[in-house]
Amino acid sequence: MRLRIRKKVKLSYQAALLHFEQHGGTAPEQPKAPLAACPNCHGTGLIAAEHPPAADTEQYPQVAIIGGGIGGVALAVACLHRGIPFTLYERDSDFSARSQGYGLTLQQASKAIAGLGIVSLDQGVVSTRHVVHNTDGTIVGEWGMRKWLDTEATHAPKRTNVHIARQSLRLALLEQLDAHPQLHEAVKWGHQLVNLHETPAGVELSFAVAGEIKTAQADLVVGADGIRSAVRNLVLGQDANSLRYLDCIAILGICPLSALSDVESDLLDSATVFQTANGHERIYVMPFAADSVMWQLSFPMAESEAQALSAQGAQALKAEACQRTQWHAPIPQILAATPAALVSGYPVYDRALLSADALADIGPVTLLGDAAHPMSPFKGQGANQALLDALSLARIIVRGCRLKPSWRELGLRERVLEEFEAEMLERSAIKVQDSADAAEFLHSEVVLHESDEPRGRCLK
């Protein structure tokens, strides 16, 4: 909600406008009333209720969400809270069928979490210090809440970063769906999309289910099925061959702190993020949970070599990581104590940025998250952008369709998708580019620039 413009601001603007009219020059910018959080929903768009609203099939389109990762489940939750009918299709047989990655850091998406009905994340860990070292342990940069408090700096951080296991966040979102009155109809496990085509009634989807082909109908299809999106391939013809290799490999692992009981280091206090680099290899270590840390080692490597190393499996990846990181404590100890079963590695890819024109002719189908704008992991933005995409799309569906039955005549692309895609692509484009740039400068001498700020900021 907007507050009233203060009298002092009005008078200042009127004086500046009078001066402009009399003497010319640059016209003053008209002041805008400041925004304040709604007292009913506190800025989340939600109010507490015993049950979610019933799905409104008269006002809203039936949404088919392809992919049960963080972005897809977040969209399902956002639809549930707004009475938008949806079905979530996931190819895995159940929640635990395969690993859903390691840890992630909620940055600007922390507010989006509240907009998805999650008041707190019990498994989340807040970091208050970020340290950058060279390989002998010399600190070349440090920032975060504790840094500013220790130095009595006058500026405080605008937000904190919350670290959480990807599966923990995904589970917290899925638990929101438990309130659905027909959960078994709303979430379809074991459904792999094999085809879709537009019909006069909407979109017909075909799924491979336990060796059979089953069909379903929807008004709107949302591809939230990751970097190798089946939806994207079907509507744009862009498969894995159109991925863009970023000339490096990432090896990840999770180490329980109990395996480091004989290691004394303030870097292992579950509230510190640290990274160490030499201008070629770079390791990043962050809290994974209260009792474990996650590490990510990355370095340049030819694509064929990276694919071969990844294919060799966890033991080979761990051995490669240990061999490359005989640096300051506790890095060698962390990697040595990491169970091989908790190590994985992959070549790092993204895709060229999509344009709105590329999506203009695909009808009532859209993409979000990695399906729309995959990016390198080096800025920690993938999950954040997927959450923002999901909340944005649900809100625009409400705005474009509620009390406006004309969406059936005008079409969802004009009524909803053009606005959503323009906002999503503009917001995520800078993140994709920054993440690609980071894949380069984090493996160069730039990462060792002495300054108390995130790496790469000195380039801007």
What spans do the regions from the language model cover?
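C-terminal helical "tail/cap" subdomain of flavin- and related membrane-associated enzymes
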Residues: 2-40, 49-57, 129, 334, ...
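Preference for well-ordered, secondary-structure-rich cores of eukaryotic proteins
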Residues: 11-12, 77-81, 86, 95, ...
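Short, well-ordered alpha-helix to beta-strand connector turns
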Residues: 60, 83, 127-128, 184, ...
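Phosphate-coordination loops involved in phosphoryl transfer and adenosine-cofactor binding
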Residues: 60-62, 190
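Conserved mid-domain beta->alpha element of the FAD-binding
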Residues: 65-85, 89, 222-223, 251, ...
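Conserved Rossmann-like nucleotide-cofactor binding loop
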Residues: 71, 94, 228
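Active-site-adjacent segment of FAD-dependent monooxygenases/related oxidoreductases
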Residues: 94-176
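Conserved FAD-binding catalytic core of PHBH/FMO-like flavoproteins
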Residues: 139, 159, 171-340
